[in-house]
Amino acid sequence: MVNLELVLNAPEYYEVIRELRTDPKNLHGFVEQVSITPEQQKNYMDKFGNDYQICLRNGEPVGFVGVVDKDIRFAVNPNYHGQGIGKFMISKLVEQNRDVLAKVMVDNVASKKVFESCGFKLYKLDENFLYFSL
């Protein structure tokens, strides 16, 4: 049986977040497509780490979700794409905080589907991004 849970972010997860954030299979989905050093990650987490949660699958970290300036940021280990982990994380996040938005690159079909499946509606569209709210 698969057990998913969200836990509070902690320093031992900073590198997990960085690895998920910079994985080539995930990087294309981020608004800022840049490589992040461990030091840059630590500095960012020192500032925003409390705004993130880690998704554990049977006790192992497989994803993260966070909100910075009302904007949802998330990633799932590519080995677990398509298994509902993104939807699980976004759904749990929305239970905790409905005052959130999502900015998705127009070609990021997977994230678009996740947000729509969690009740988000498109409210704005431009050349590069889709903007969703609840």
What positions do the PLM features span?
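Residue-level detector of high-confidence beta-strand sites
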Residues: 64, 123-125
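A conserved beta-strand-loop-helix scaffold within acyl/acetyltransferase catalytic domains
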Residues: 34-37, 63-70
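Conserved beta-hairpin
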Residues: 51-63
